[in-house]
């Protein structure tokens, strides 16, 4: 007996506690008293920071500047007590709700589950009631598997992988033997025939798709939360046509208007600014792929799998000089391009430099550019209440924004280079009795000789040329690119190779899954068999 009505009740009633043991398989009875919890809010596994909200697609500081993260060491905790705390019971990350008798509900606690007739499967099709059905013979020994993998910011992405002869379907679309597809919340899973719906998949870590505008849902599948801030959040998403990952920045119009007096400041015209930023095209600048203006703003950005430069520096304590050179060369190219197009970033910091991969040698991209255009004068003054570690001296001593020019970005680049080479910030209120503002405005940075002993004189010289208090005497991006430290042909060749690899990967067409021609077991109904012929696999969601 079909129990799809129970699932509809589950979808409409929201989250409730589940009484079944974690990771258990429970026989489905078609009762509304069964566990019906659906997560109504995102529970990202990303590490939180008390200093800054950020994401792998960039921080939210293009629309609000948050307090800058600090690099100083955290004091060690006191010695733990002798008694070790009990291990917490793992919470399920997903739930499969059975739609037919003979199948059982499943709460997913482990990272991998096989489904099929084989006894080795974690979810074995061995119920006597199921074995008596005609469809049982069409199921494979290992029909499909559901698993999750670590994605951006240590969040997880759920996938379904087809290993059957007669097909596994997600929302009536064939996955294709040997192919995988991201599995999003409320997806319906059918076996052998697209109409033979067996499970509904509930991702307990993400929001329901229905809360997003239809125009957005038509093109993208929304997934995990990657970062959040006072005015919005950043979500991982998948393009429906290609299944490629993207990052979608969501800005709350209501919170943004309240927080920045938007109506009183015409500079806060997000729509106009987005149109300008969409025209920017540089390999070292995050590309805006799409924009949706609904109840909130939705900005679709390319996803950077390597995360933030800040995390890279913290994780490694400091970067190799060769790595610093490769990254900094790209930063200079990006900022030079912005300046040539009349844009001053004014919020350059390691959190706004994203890495294309976890590899040591990789492309970087500047994000949250256009800060100076999106934020008005009043809002910018509020950002100075935070820790201005990367702000140029002229910003701290000026009243309002008058007098700012592109030199402020070059100062920030100098601070970033200092941090990458040494592993600590040049200016910090935690290391001296001198106020942070006085340190910056006097240009007296914290120089530790034993740390810098491993850094070349050329690299240190470039840092000094950028951290000049007088903006007129400070190095420009053009001068920095001509500096002897960056006249490294091997480094430039490596950058070009990485660029070529990226261009090749983005140019390759998406290989769509094709149906299997295997007919080891009978397929029910010849007419139904035609459903799986030459059907391209696409990302899909129940909307």
Curated annotation (Swiss-Prot):
Domain Protein kinase positions: 220-486
Amino-acid positions noted as binding ATP in the UniProt annotation, renumbered to this chain: 227-234, 249, 302-308, 351-352, 368
Mutagenesis or variant effect for residue 180 to C: In prostate cancer; somatic mutation
Effect ascribed to mutating residue 85 to L: Found in an osteogenic sarcoma sample; somatic mutation
Bias (Polar residues) ranges: 8-22, 506-517
InterPro entries: FHA_dom (IPR000253), Kinase-like_dom_sf (IPR011009), Prot_kinase_dom (IPR000719), Ser/Thr_kinase_AS (IPR008271), SMAD_FHA_dom_sf (IPR008984)
Modified residues (Phosphoserine): 62, 73, 379, 456
Result for mutant: residue 387 to A: Loss of phosphorylation in response to ionizing radiation
UniProt-reported outcome of changing residue 428 to F: May increase breast cancer risk
Region of interest: Disordered: 1-66, 506-538
SUPFAM superfamilies in alphabetical order: Protein kinase-like (PK-like) (SSF56112), SMAD/FHA domain (SSF49879)
The entry's keywords: Apoptosis, ATP-binding, Cell cycle, Cell division, Disease variant, DNA damage, DNA repair, Host-virus interaction, Kinase, Li-Fraumeni syndrome, Magnesium, Metal-binding, Mitosis, Nucleotide-binding, Nucleus, Phosphoprotein, Serine/threonine-protein kinase, Transcription, Transcription regulation, Transferase, Tumor suppressor, Ubl conjugation
Compositionally biased region (Basic and acidic residues): 523-534
Residue ranges, annotated region (T-loop/activation segment): 368-394
Effect caused by changing residue 145 to P: In prostate cancer; somatic mutation
Superkingdom as given in the UniProt entry: Eukaryota
Any GO molecular function: protein kinase binding
Record's subcellular location: Nucleus, PML body; Nucleus, Nucleoplasm
Function: Serine/threonine-protein kinase which is required for checkpoint-mediated cell cycle arrest, activation of DNA repair and apoptosis in response to the presence of DNA double-strand breaks. May also negatively regulate cell cycle progression during unperturbed cell cycles. Following activation, phosphorylates numerous effectors preferentially at the consensus sequence [L-X-R-X-X-S/T]. Regulates cell cycle checkpoint arrest through phosphorylation of CDC25A, CDC25B and CDC25C, inhibiting their activity. (Microbial infection) Phosphorylates herpes simplex virus 1/HHV-1 protein ICP0 and thus activates its SUMO-targeted ubiquitin ligase activity.
Record's disease association: Tumor predisposition syndrome 4: A disorder characterized by an increased risk for developing various types of benign and/or malignant neoplasms that arise at an accelerated rate and in different organs.
Name the UniProt record assigns to this protein: Serine/threonine-protein kinase Chk2
The organism of origin for this protein: Homo sapiens (Human)
Lineage, highest ranks first: Eukaryota, Metazoa, Chordata, Craniata, Vertebrata
């Amino acid at each position: 007996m079909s129990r799809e009505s129970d699932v509809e009740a589950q979808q409409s009633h929201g989250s409730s506690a589940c009484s079944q043991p974690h990771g258990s398989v429970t026989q489905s009875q078609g009762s509304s008293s069964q566990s019906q919890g659906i997560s109504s809010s995102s529970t990202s596994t990303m590490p939180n920071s008390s200093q800054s909200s950020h994401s792998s697609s960039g921080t939210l500081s293009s629309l609000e500047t948050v307090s800058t993260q600090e690099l100083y060491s955290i004091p060690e905790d006191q010695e733990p007590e002798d008694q070790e705390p009990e291990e917490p019971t793992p919470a399920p990350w997903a739930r499969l709700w059975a739609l037919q008798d003979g199948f059982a509900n499943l709460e997913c606690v482990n990272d991998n589950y096989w489904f099929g007739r084989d006894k080795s499967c974690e979810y074995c099709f061995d119920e006597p009631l199921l074995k008596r059905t005609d469809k049982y013979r069409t199921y494979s020994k290992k029909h499909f598997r559901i698993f999750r993998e670590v994605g951006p910011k240590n969040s997880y992405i759920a996938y379904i992988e087809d290993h059957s002869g007669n097909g596994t379907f997600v929302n009536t679309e064939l996955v294709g033997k040997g192919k995988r597809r991201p599995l999003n919340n409320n997806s319906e899973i059918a076996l052998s025939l697209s109409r033979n719906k067996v499970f509904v998949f509930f991702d307990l870590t993400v929001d329901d798709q229905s809360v997003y505008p239809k125009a957005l849902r038509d093109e993208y599948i929304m997934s995990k939360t990657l970062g959040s801030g006072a005015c919005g959040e950043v979500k991982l998403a998948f393009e429906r046509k290609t299944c490629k990952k993207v990052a979608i920045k969501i800005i709350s119009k209501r919170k943004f208007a309240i927080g920045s007096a938007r109506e009183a400041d015409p500079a806060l015209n997000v729509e106009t600014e987005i149109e300008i930023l969409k025209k920017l095209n540089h390999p070292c600048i995050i590309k805006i792929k799409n924009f949706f203006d609904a109840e909130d703003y939705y900005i679709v950005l390319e996803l950077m799998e390597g995360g933030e430069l800040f995390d890279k520096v913290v994780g490694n304590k400091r970067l190799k000089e060769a790595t610093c050179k490769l990254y900094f060369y790209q930063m200079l190219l990006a900022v030079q391009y912005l300046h040539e197009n009349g844009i001053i970033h004014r919020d350059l910091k390691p959190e706004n430099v994203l890495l294309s991969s976890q590899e040591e040698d990789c492309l970087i991209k500047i994000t949250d550019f256009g800060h100076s255009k999106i934020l008005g004068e009043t809002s910018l003054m509020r950002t100075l209440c935070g820790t201005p570690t990367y702000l140029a001296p002229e910003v701290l001593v000026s009243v309002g924004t008058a007098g700012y020019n592109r030199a402020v970005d070059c100062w920030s680049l100098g601070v970033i280079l200092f941090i990458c080479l040494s592993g600590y910030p040049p200016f910090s209120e935690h290391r001296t009795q001198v106020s942070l503002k006085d340190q910056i405005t006097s240009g007296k940075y914290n120089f530790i000789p034993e740390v810098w002993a491993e850094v070349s004189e050329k690299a240190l010289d470039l840092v000094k040329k950028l951290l000049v208090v007088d903006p007129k005497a400070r190095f420009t991006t053009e001068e920095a690119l001509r500096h002897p430290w960056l006249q490294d042909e091997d480094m430039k060749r490596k950058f070009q190779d990485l660029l070529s690899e990226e261009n090749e990967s983005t140019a390759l067409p998406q290989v769509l899954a094709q149906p299997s021609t295997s007919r080891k077991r009978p397929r029910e109904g010849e007419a139904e068999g035609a459903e799986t012929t030459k059907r391209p696999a696409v990302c899909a969601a129940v909307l």
